[in-house]
């Protein structure tokens, strides 16, 4: 009504002091102001409609600075529609704008004699334009062309004259596309004062992170937008992974770093990792990375900054296998105290270690043999040359680790010089030959070496004709040969002498086997007998039958081999024909059938109905809107607001309910998805499952009513009450959640989003599973790294089993994994699983069998149950029925909950590595190989005799190669596990008494 004014006494309440509100800014977030009325002292001159609505007044803040405000209080009249529009605000190329409103609202109940149209809310709108074109009548004062941002409700209203309280609300809108915009405020019957309005936008400040520089970046068009900011490495840094970028989120905060830089060689981090500083002279850094510069190793130096390696001093070297951080070393001094012991044509050399090893521990010895000719006296110098290859060194000539060598097969009456060299890993780097100690010896007269081989020239029923080669080392003139022979079955030996290297043995028995040996003789005596050789005389009937008998095994073997080959060819042909008859789709011709036991209640997916409304009618109760009273907004959901209200059904007492509303302007798909949660909840009836009261679908807005849970979500409830509950109380909460999940699993329902944030708590600390809105189906798009569901939500990586992330295999077993994470959340009082690790780091850690450590004061039995839930093989995880039984036993046996892990909690404790099995838990070597996923080698281990853990613990890489483990990766895995086994054995050795 024209000329209407607020009731007497209300105006003073509409101009309270402006209280400063200090909000912690987001990490690295910047706010740039587009408009702020707080600092305006002259008239704002905004446009109001009608003129009797909003009124501009002056006031003072707490510092007595003048401020301009707008107020309205036409509560005595119904059907109010008062509009207020700001001046034109330039957008500055931003896509999303934030509005901070400071206002006061009077409680309608404190104003006497007012109609029921009094409100405590107002609406925020905006209108885009390319220039300042608005007038008093254009655009029309209504929603559309104006775009509604939100309905603004106060946190606190006031009722007394001296108790005005300032509310601060921040809302955002976008995306914006035109040059600027207007803000508009609609009052529909409130008594309020608009104290200040600030329009601003957010951006991520320029930052240096991970040795990379990222520029100042505007936020995106949506709160969930991620804007890519390309980065560049700082000076003296290099890229270690590409592309190098950082994401700016909608709150102006940097997140999700991709790629990284690190300090180059010769440079170390400085100024809190914002600089890479050159290493000063006398220090170096060999590898790129975040490590510091190090002093030069012994016997090395640098003379300039930014050195990546220190050069060795003169006569000092590094081996090719030495790292840059190794000390420079030198060659060893000669061996000491060489002793020779000659025995005819062989000798033994022994020596002592050099005085100076050159600073290395890879000392080896070489023995150089030289044969000398000529006089050793005054008649002239001797001429020496390298020995022949037939000289034998035991254990070897080069690369000796022992300080003793046996040398044989030398020539008799010959002078030799032996040089014993000391070498190490840098001897090849030195321009000088290895240092050595020499010894001269002369061999004595010696008997000839043994005859190498005997040959059969002919045989008969009574004789054998044999020949042989002369000894390799006759050591003089061969005088004759002596042959020893005897019939193998009798063992009585006879001898015969020959001047030549052949002989015929006569008077032998027919068809008999004889053992023959021969030796040579010089003036020094007989040499050793040759190795025994066996020869056989023929039978008197002739050799034809004997030849046939000798060839019979060959004939039989060839026949059998031919038959086996034919059988293999026939089998292969049959297999190929069978594969041709069975097409590639044969494996899909049979389908699995699910049989449900009589009387068992089974969950029915509402998305299987042709008409989703039919599922709602079948499983949810329709409630008349007159029975519902909305009291206040307590949150916002994906589809609309979440409110607290009351439900009064005929014949029943009034109860508090939580009300989810469907926002205005919904699509049919949004309505279907919104009501699908009611169709799901309506099928459940369990004290630990959130109860559906009903739905309102025949009026607007569409609503879902559930029981009201006073303590809201479990995670925030635990954080607010950190350390306030006993272990028994926490286990009781976990038991309730497990009981609810047991009920769901028995109904064949997979939750897929089990987390503490989706568990609601009532005033009696009863926990109930909620949030059944996650889509049951995931889009099969393997190129999408976020694994988004059909509702657009992302899979909660930190709570999801690895098979569900990798293959989207959601089962009750994957819910068990999530339950283990919920257990960890409860025992840590709402701490974030995996702390500040990125989602990709979490995936990698879980894939490498790392698990969360026990929270502070967590009973060992509970953490073991968590680890059981996090077993990689989903078939080995406990069922929810087993989890409930385990928790019941723990509750009955409270003493078991007093045993806690001694490790610290929180981020200071690393993730637990679950890959090292305790060998004492296995009964056989085969079980151990199965546990480390090397079961394919069980037969190889047993066949080679490694059937006990004591023998396995002594195995080397050569042993693995010998039994058939040829793959380098498998060798490494088995050897690492053997090393762990040795450590465990050392820790559990019994004490001898």
From Swiss-Prot:
Knockout-associated phenotype: Mice are viable and fertile and show no obvious abnormal behavior. The corpus callosum, the main axon tract connecting the left and right cerebral hemispheres, is not formed in a significant fraction of newborns. This is associated with defects in guidance of callosal axons across the midline.
Keyword Repeat attributed: yes
Domain of life: Eukaryota
Disulfide bond annotation, renumbered to this chain: 73-191
Extracellular side: 30-554
Renumbered ranges of motif PDZ-binding: 991-993
GO cellular component, as recorded: dendrite; plasma membrane
Domain Eph LBD: 31-209
Tissue spec. comment: Expressed in cells of the retinal ganglion cell layer during retinal axon guidance to the optic disk. Expressed by Paneth and progenitor cells in the crypts of the intestinal epithelium (at protein level). Expressed in myogenic progenitor cells.
Binding residue positions for ATP: 634-642, 660
Alphabetic keyword roster: Angiogenesis, ATP-binding, Cell membrane, Cell projection, Developmental protein, Disulfide bond, Glycoprotein, Kinase, Membrane, Neurogenesis, Nucleotide-binding, Phosphoprotein, Receptor, Repeat, Signal, Transferase, Transmembrane, Transmembrane helix, Tyrosine-protein kinase, Ubl conjugation
Location within or outside the cell: Cell membrane; Cell projection, Dendrite
Glycosylation sites noted in the Swiss-Prot or TrEMBL record: 343, 440
Enzyme Commission number: 2.7.10.1
Fibronectin type-III domain boundaries: 331-446, 447-540
Catalytic residue list: 753 (proton acceptor)
Family designation: Belongs to the protein kinase superfamily. Tyr protein kinase family. Ephrin receptor subfamily.
Protein name as catalogued: Ephrin type-B receptor 3
Lineage: Eukaryota, Metazoa, Chordata, Craniata, Vertebrata
